[in-house]
Each structure stands twice: as C-alpha cells, then as structure tokens.
Amino acid sequence: RLTALVDCDDIHCLMIGASGVGKTAYFLYPNIEYTCASGMSFFASDTKGDLARNYGTIARDCYGYQVSVVDLRNPTKSDGYNLLTLINHYMDVCRREPTNLAARAKAEKYAKILSKTIINPDGENFAQNQYFYDAAEGVLTAVTLLLAEYLPPKRIHGELRERRERRHIVSVFKLVQELLAPSILPGKNEFQLLMDRLPEEHKAKWFSGSALTAAEQSMASVMSTVLSRLNTFLDSELEQVLCFDSTIDAESFAAKKSSIFQILPEEDQTKNFLAGLMIQTLSRELFSVADEHDGKLPCRAMSLS
C-alpha cells in the first residue's frame, strides 16, 4: 500500500509546450488577468517583452497597479532597479532618527541579504576556501552600509534631485577598489585605515572583523574576491538600470498592488546573472517581509514566467 501526501493548492504550475502552442496567449495572459482582477502583486519575466507591452498598461490603467519594467534587452529604456534601494531608505531614516534601532536593523538585514546573494548566490560550500567567501560577505556588507550611511543623495542648489542618487552597486565597486590600495602605513591598506576611524561599536567594523584580523595576503585575497564578484556589474548599459532607484521595492511589492516585468534577452547570456540576482534578491527580501507578518505577505504575490 502506498500513501501519498498531495498538496492540491494552486501554488505551483509548470506548462511545457512547443513554440506556437499558446503558452503565453492562452495560459499566461488569462492568469495575469485573473491576478490583476484579484488584486495580487506579481512578477513576470519573458524574453520578448510581450507581457510588459500587452499587460503593463492594462495593469496600470485598468486595475490601478504600480508597474515597473526592468528591460535588460534595452537597458537605456528600462526603469531603474537599484539593488540598494531598501538599504538606502532605512539608512535615511536612521540619519533623521538616530535612535531608531529598528530602521538600522533593517538596513543591516537587507545589506546582508544582498551580500550573500552576490558572493554566494547558489549557497555552495567552498571547503577550504570557505573562509575567504564568508569574509568577503562581511566586507561587502560593511562597505554597503558605509556607503548608504555616509554618501547621501547629491543636492544641487540645496534641492534633493531624484535622479542624483549615488548609492548603488557600481559605487560599492569603486569604493572597494579605492580601499584596496596600499596606505601610507606599511602593512595596512586603505580599508583597514578606514575601519580604524570608525567607533568600536559600529556594525560595519564588526561585519568586516574576520578580514581585518587576517594576514596581509589573506586580506588581499578577501578584497579581490569581493572585486571579482562585483566585476559583473561593470557594464555601461546595465548601469542605466542599476544606478537609478527602483520604482518598486520588496516592501511596497508586498503591501500594494504591484507588478514587475522583467525582459531578459535569450540571445545575450551575459544578462542571465543579473536577472537571477534580481529574482533571488527580491525573493529573499519577500521572505524577510513575510517573517515580520507571521509568515504571510500582506498582499499575495505570484511569479509568472
């Protein structure tokens, strides 16, 4: 006798069909229509851009959704998708309210999520090299937090300009590269000198502790690991996406009727890493939001690809 536990909820569904059988027209479109009518947030990805063209306007104008289109096929025409949006938001709250520990904790949490997703997206075990990757996560978290805290948006003539945000992943790369340079003190690089200037209780100093106590060669290896992971983001086209604030972050996605359309060109394999990183980061941030609401998101969300 066999006993099977069957989950009959309509949570996951996989449709397989040859080209032209109607996977998009007869399956995805009705599901997106149902999702919009039900008021659920959704993330949709495709390689042609048909979903965004045909249903982005419908979702916004007919159902009142906030819509974001991340177009990796034509990045210069895409909405922004700054990976540091939530980190920057909560650091800005901390700057206005220095005693707000909850906001600082959230900034640190989202910085750790981003660092883990960039350094070790697949959750691999690197055996004897595990130390370098763990230390690299700590260094990347520390640099991200410092950037969010001490590099506020640029003001022009006293006014804060929306598109002058300087806190993004490319700035993180530039800062790590500059801090890797040797300092005037022998045996120390600029990163170690910067950490020495921070108060003892500053969390950035704690996150980078394993790297700071390492030998000079090990420290250089850790910093090189961070740089090698960040090299992927150095692309003039992709910077048009990564260097501008997201119109929708994970918290607003979970709280309001929102739709994110991701267009991924199948002929350009170099964009796959960034697409996967966006999905992983959004998923982990949504898990974190759900943890704050008894394991459930305030607004039900779906992923349609």
Task: Please report, for each region that a protein language model flagged, where it lies by residue.
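P-loop NTPase motor domains
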Residues: 4-305
